[in-house]
Amino acid sequence: MARGPKKHLKRLAAPKAWMLDKLGGVFAPRPSTGPHKLRESLPLLIFLRNRLKYALNGAEVTKIVMQRLVKVDGKVRTDPTYPAGYMDVITLEKTGEFFRLVYDVKGRFVIHRISAEEAKYKLCKVKKTQLGAKGVPFLVTHDGRTIRYPDPLIHANDSVQVDIASGKITDYIKFDSGNLCMITGGRNLGRVGTVVNRERHPGSFDIVHIKDSQGHVFATRLTNVFIIGKGNKPYISLPKGKGVKLSIAEERDKRLAAKTH
């Protein structure tokens, strides 16, 4: 009989995107509850130990975070299993490094270094807008923020640029055809392209057709589309490969070309 929340996560049940080896133990760090879903997050422990190699084991990560050296979205986080997720800015002030968590085309969180200037803001997808107590309008974002008194032109599925220090909206991007977007779920996870059109299916899932910079067209659900730029101009820097998914043959040719040079 299950009593209360689960406290463990087996290695084999952990998200593939964490890229943990099967034989490295029985368990994986179970992310704490937080602004991102368990399967769409990356615990700080894996980020510092497995990705950045700043620690050899979990105990060392705990020592690092307990020195209050790690900030996520401008707030010090001392929980080694804090779930950092898509678009979060991780700051290590001691080394002067800034990272933004974004997906690569294989659907994994990529360690994407950014400048101090870019680390001052993040993009958030608007989940819903509504009226709160006393008729105060507010919107809810994909990372659990509630922002009051937004611009009345902002609606669900748009993206807002949030200043991390103040939590205020500095700019917004409408969900429109021709705008740049990144896919945050499904088999096209991590791909970047421009919105071609949106098929409305009342009572079901709206389908969005997207075209990448190579001219490939693919479709996904509206819930997986995250607007990241106006026209072809992204508001954030993109990781290596610019979100273009190569076919298996193209990947092979690229590898062979790299070997011959």
Curated annotation (Swiss-Prot):
Q: Which GO terms describe its biological process?
A: cytoplasmic translation; translation
Which key words tag this protein in UniProt?
A: Ribonucleoprotein, Ribosomal protein, RNA-binding, rRNA-binding
Cross-referenced Pfam families: 40S_S4_C (PF16121), KOW (PF00467), Ribosomal_S4e (PF00900), RS4NT (PF08071), S4 (PF01479)
The S4 RNA-binding domain is annotated at 42-104
Q: Which GO terms describe its cellular component?
A: cytosolic ribosome; cytosolic small ribosomal subunit
InterPro entries per record: KOW, Rib_uL2_dom2, Ribosomal_eS4, Ribosomal_eS4_C, Ribosomal_eS4_central_region, Ribosomal_eS4_central_sf, Ribosomal_eS4_KOW, Ribosomal_eS4_N
For whether the record's keyword set contains RNA-binding, the answer is yes
Q: A Gene Ontology molecular-function term? A: RNA binding
Keyword RNA-binding listed? The answer is yes
* Record-linked CDD domains: KOW_RPS4, S4
Q: Which PANTHER family match?
A: 30S/40S RIBOSOMAL PROTEIN S4, SMALL RIBOSOMAL SUBUNIT PROTEIN ES4
Membership in a protein family? Belongs to the eukaryotic ribosomal protein eS4 family.
| Protein's recorded name | Small ribosomal subunit protein eS4
Q: Which gene encodes it?
A: RpS4
